[in-house]
Design a protein with these regions (language model features):
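Extended, low-hydrophobicity, polar/charged segments
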Residues: 1-159
Length: 159
């Protein structure tokens, strides 16, 4: 059930063996934490937004929520999620499996600092039945991220 595109993407960057297949869905932060056996905060949720009519991906800790003011300061627009029925077309992945690995090259990937407090984080692996275990630094390398950002709120209370 693994996503071959994601498997090859990770393998080509030296992260072979990090993709884990699950018997139950990990389509939400809650489901992912239950299947992986970690806190919900350690789930690296991948959100896809429209900025200037183009997709942008932001990966953040599972307990983080988008802070509109911080988002606008970075992207110069209010946060607007990609409509659910357009997620596959724009990112290459279905909702519940969107990940920062193997998205089209013209989509910038940002990592929120909310994940830096953890030894490991767990983003989806391209579908709702796979995840990847990486340190935040490894996630930065594996995702070809633009860099780190600060667009979340809510997670500071749980540090």
């Amino acid at each position: 059930m693994r996503n071959e595109k994601v498997y090859e993407w990770l393998k080509n960057r030296g992260f072979e063996g990090r993709l884990t297949e699950h018997s139950e869905t990990i389509d939400t932060v809650e489901h992912a934490a239950q299947q992986i056996g970690c806190s919900e905060a350690e789930i690296a949720k991948t959100l896809s937004f429209i900025v200037d009519d183009k997709p942008v991906v932001v990966v953040m800790a599972g307990d983080g929520r988008v802070n509109s003011s911080k988002f606008k300061a970075l992207f110069h627009t209010k946060p607007s999620m990609i409509p659910r029925d357009m997620v596959v077309e724009m990112t290459g992945f279905a909702p519940g499996g969107v990940c920062p690995f193997g998205v089209p090259a013209d989509i910038p990937i940002w990592l929120d600092i909310s994940m830096k407090r953890f030894e490991y984080v767990h983003p989806a692996g391209g579908n709702e039945f796979t995840s990847v275990r990486l340190t935040p630094e490894e996630l930065e390398k594996a995702s070809d991220a633009v860099g780190w950002c600060d667009v979340c709120k809510g997670w500071e209370e749980t540090v």
